[in-house]
């Protein structure tokens, strides 16, 4: 008899206490991952247990081992046995330029700080030149995550929580979930090549429309929803068959020139009766892509940097693509200023706490979209198995039994608390730097302990006056 631990969720299987060997299980009882994900944590004289179902290509368990210190060994083993590319959930865990390497300068005498409790403006306008700008009470909102990747309960809780903070909820690329939209304070509809939920009514009852060109974890690829997540309700929204994989094209077939994109923006602006129209791009060819976007005359542009997450993306792409968010934002702000553009700039990709957001505001962003942070507030425990459909907490799943585990009322309140705390803390960052609005935060408030950040942004190094 031995004791094992699931490397995904940490569940313990003590064979003696449970009364049967690990090999008799089909999957982890908590996260539903295969028992090959268990590792032995107590040595016994007994022969190590192995999975009852093995491939002829599996490595001999008497010699196979895991060693995170050997670059890509486990990934190569998995690809070699399965014959398929690896898909992974959430964001990269590789070393990244960190928001924690940027520090704020607290005001003392020149300038002086504000007093505790002094009023600070957090109101945020997206698309100020649009006929019907979107007005939020905070510069933070919940980013695009689809119904399909997430459960109905999770999407609705996120929307209700965003409404508690008087900020926006985004649809994601899976079309509009009516319960989510009804709960929203402000709603941003994502317009994708598959045209899910594109009707005159949906365009005129959303508060902004965002054309999705790409996302940070899989730039140049369309979204993918595995068939096991395509329930009758999701199939109806997307106009697809139940149980079949859903793949979005990697690009709009009707966009082949700047003029084509401009026509799309103008058409959506007309159909939506003047709602702000945005364009979302992954951070890659930043300046060239921004020039293309500006020619289309959008009301806002969203840039998705390296460090962001998704329910499932090709592991090899996630680990090898996209400009890190700090550098992407710096380059975008510089380019837009050089062009004299006043388009609203939104950033997403790895920002979670108020200090991240305050620093992004100081670098010149108008608003920040958060995804992983909001999911954590709702209940996500980072099992990182979103694509499996077996999320133990009922968030990234369509399994009816798993969905019951998410208390929607509690999740909504937690999301609301999270967003409201972020907003209050942003006010504090404004006060300690002597600013009456969070949108007055600027580069003069920043310094960095990273020479790379100092060399490739305008943030000064802490060792220099």
Please place each PLM-identified region on the residue numbering.
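Residues immediately within or flanking Cys/His clusters that coordinate Zn2+
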Residues: 3, 25, 388
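Short, cysteine/histidine-rich loop/knuckle motifs that typically chelate Zn2+
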Residues: 7-8, 29-30, 390
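Short linker/helix segments within small regulatory modules
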Residues: 17-26
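Active-site-facing alpha/beta catalytic cores
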Residues: 137, 144, 149-267, 271-278, ...
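Glycine-rich phosphate/ribose-binding loops and adjacent secondary-structure elements
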Residues: 249-403
């Amino acid at each position: 008899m031995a004791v094992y631990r699931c490397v995904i969720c940490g569940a313990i299987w003590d064979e003696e206490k449970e009364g049967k060997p690990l090999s008799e299980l089909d999957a982890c009882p908590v996260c539903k991952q295969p028992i090959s994900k268990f590792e032995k944590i107590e040595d016994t004289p007994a022969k190590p247990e192995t999975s009852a179902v093995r491939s002829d290509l599996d490595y001999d368990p008497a010699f196979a081992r895991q060693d995170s210190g050997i670059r890509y060994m486990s990934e190569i083993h998995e690809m070699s046995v399965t014959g398929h590319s690896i898909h992974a959930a959430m964001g990269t865990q590789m070393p990244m330029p960190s928001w924690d390497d940027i520090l704020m300068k607290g005001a003392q005498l020149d300038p002086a700080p504000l007093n505790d409790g002094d009023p600070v403006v957090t109101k945020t306008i997206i698309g100020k030149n649009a006929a019907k700008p979107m007005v939020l009470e905070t510069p933070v909102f919940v980013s695009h995550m689809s119904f399909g990747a997430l459960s109905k309960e999770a999407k609705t809780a996120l929307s209700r929580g965003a409404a508690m903070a008087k900020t926006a909820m985004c649809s994601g690329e899976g079309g509009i979930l009516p319960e989510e939209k009804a709960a929203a304070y402000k709603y941003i509809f994502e317009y994708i090549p598959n045209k899910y939920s594109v009707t005159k009514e949906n365009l005129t009852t959303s508060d902004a429309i965002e054309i999705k060109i790409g996302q940070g974890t899989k730039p140049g690829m369309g979204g993918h929803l595995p068939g096991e997540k395509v329930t009758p309700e999701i199939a109806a929204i997307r106009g697809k068959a139940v149980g079949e994989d859903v793949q979005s094209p990697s690009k709009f077939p009707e966009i082949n020139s700047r003029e084509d994109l401009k026509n799309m923006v103008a058409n959506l602006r007309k159909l939506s009766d003047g709602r702000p129209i945005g364009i979302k791009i992954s951070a890659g060819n930043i300046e060239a892509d921004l020039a293309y976007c500006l020619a289309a005359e959008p009301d806002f542009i969203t840039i998705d940097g390296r460090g962001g997450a998704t329910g499932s993306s090709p592991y090899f792409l996630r680990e090898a693509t996209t400009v890190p968010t700090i550098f992407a934002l710096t380059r975008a702000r510089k380019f837009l200023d050089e062009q004299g553009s006043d388009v609203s700039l939104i950033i997403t990709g790895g920002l979670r706490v108020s200090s991240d957001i305050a620093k992004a505001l100081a670098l010149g962003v108008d608003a920040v979209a958060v995804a992983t942070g909001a999911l954590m507030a709702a209940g996500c425990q980072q099992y990182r198995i979103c694509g499996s459909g077996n999320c133990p907490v009922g968030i990234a799943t369509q399994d009816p039994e798993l969905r019951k585990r998410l208390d929607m009322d509690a999740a909504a309140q937690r999301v609301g608390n999270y967003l409201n705390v972020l907003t209050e803390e942003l006010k504090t960052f404004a006060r300690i730097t002597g600013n009456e609005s969070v949108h007055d935060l600027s580069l003069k408030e920043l310094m960095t302990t990273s020479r790379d950040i100092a060399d490739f942004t305008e943030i000064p190094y802490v060792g220099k006056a």
